[in-house]
């Protein structure tokens, strides 16, 4: 009995008609219990699975200055007090909005910082 290589199989398939190829695919699907369309369906599954997964609650927040009102000096003072930055660094942060004041902090601390900055005259977002 001679062995058949992959190359022999490929050459044989190349000589088949479209109808014969279709019948071959159907026969392979039945014999091995697979579907030729499965990879396409499987590619779409992760998107649905991701939507069904429960959303994890965010535990770390960032405080971002999005705008500075008329009280720029007060905002700079608050940024210095909150971040322990020097005067020049705090001024640069306030002038280059949006700017992250603090990141990776708990929600209650982020809310307290946002309140301080808002009272000083800044527009703030918690992300």
UniProtKB/Swiss-Prot annotation:
A GO cellular component entry from the record: cytosolic large ribosomal subunit
GO MF entries: mRNA binding; structural constituent of ribosome
InterPro entries: Ribosomal_bL12 (IPR000206), Ribosomal_bL12_C (IPR013823), Ribosomal_bL12_C/ClpS-like (IPR014719), Ribosomal_bL12_oligo (IPR008932), Ribosomal_bL12_oligo_N_sf (IPR036235)
A Pfam family the protein falls into: Ribosomal_L12_N
CDD domains in UniProt: Ribosomal_L7_L12 (cd00387)
Entries under Gene3D superfamilies matching the protein: 3.30.1390.10, Single helix bin
Keyword entries, A-Z: Ribonucleoprotein, Ribosomal protein
Source domain of life: Bacteria
Signal peptide start-end: none
GO BP term (any one): translation
Described function: Forms part of the ribosomal stalk which helps the ribosome interact with GTP-bound translation factors. Is thus essential for accurate translation.
Assembly information from the UniProt record: Homodimer. Part of the ribosomal stalk of the 50S ribosomal subunit. Forms a multimeric L10(L12)X complex, where L10 forms an elongated spine to which 2 to 4 L12 dimers bind in a sequential fashion. Binds GTP-bound translation factors.
Family per similarity comment: Belongs to the bacterial ribosomal protein bL12 family.
HAMAP family: Ribosomal_bL12
Protein name, as recorded: Large ribosomal subunit protein bL12
Organism field: Syntrophobacter fumaroxidans (strain DSM 10017 / MPOB)
Lineage of the species this protein comes from: Bacteria, Pseudomonadati, Thermodesulfobacteriota, Syntrophobacteria, Syntrophobacterales
């Amino acid at each position: 009995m001679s062995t058949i290589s992959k190359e022999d199989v490929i050459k044989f398939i190349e000589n088949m008609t479209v109808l014969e190829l279709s019948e071959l695919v159907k026969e392979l699907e039945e014999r091995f219990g697979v579907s030729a369309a499965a990879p396409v369906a499987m590619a779409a599954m992760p998107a649905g699975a991701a939507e069904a997964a429960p959303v994890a609650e965010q535990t770390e927040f960032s405080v971002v200055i999005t705008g500075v009102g008329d009280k720029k000096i007060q905002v700079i003072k608050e940024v210095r007090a909150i971040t322990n930055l020097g005067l020049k660094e705090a001024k640069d942060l306030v002038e280059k909005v949006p700017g992250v004041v603090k990141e990776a902090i708990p929600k209650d601390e982020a809310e307290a910082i946002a309140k301080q900055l808002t009272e000083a005259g800044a527009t703030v977002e918690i992300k």
